Amino acid sequence: MFEEALLEKVDICNEILKDCRNELYLNLRFLDVALHSLVLEPSMSLGAAATDGAAFCYNPEYLIGLYKVGNVQVNRCYLHSILHCLFGHVWKKREEQELLYWNLACDIAVEYILDGLPLRCLRNPPKPYRRAVYEGLLKKIPVIHGEGVFHLLQDANPDMRIVARMVQEFTVDSHMLWQKDGSGPKSPIEQQNRWGDIRDKMELEMDVFSKEAAEGSKGLKAQLRVENRERYDYREFLKKFCILKEEMQVDLDSFDYI
């Protein structure tokens, strides 16, 4: 009886996440590959949701409860985990004593992107507290991204009450599956390289093919540029362009030569 009830809940969750992916794709087409790059995996050992770069793991009870609050919450939770993968947060090695600041920094960076996307499917107007955090960070770094926020937290070493307040505000998913060791076709290195390729193609698509779709996604684009620091020369552009298998008129004036 319990197993039947659980299977029914998993089926419901699969439908919820299918609708979530479709809605996000319709609004953010340049995220197509990324949105479908995680296997959906129910897990009763989790209290909420988590990703290891290969799967989106979720507690069925948690996901159904989130959906009852609203589909926006499900959309934000799923995209939150996708963005952790896109920016390589999952595989960055940190010492045990650094994990609190690193986890918080990554969550702030991802939530900043979500709060900046002017889409109804993600709409959750940031509270004054969030806005104050973002404004304070932007006075110190030009782009809010995981590495930058992490180093600011390290340097500031804020009172633990302040840290606890930020953790409460920005935590969405569990990071317990991050930094896993292993080997094989689903090894961390293999996953990291795969997501790096997705990130490269996505930045190019935002630059060349999806200017309208990317409008309003400046926070996302800025973080992509931080991760993809190398500038395109002509050969690199053509190489990545061919992978996209798209037809376009190459405008040689649209890039810098280094």
Predicted segments, located by residue:
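Negatively charged
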Residues: 115-258
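Basic/hydrophobic alpha-helical interface regions
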Residues: 1-74, 78-120
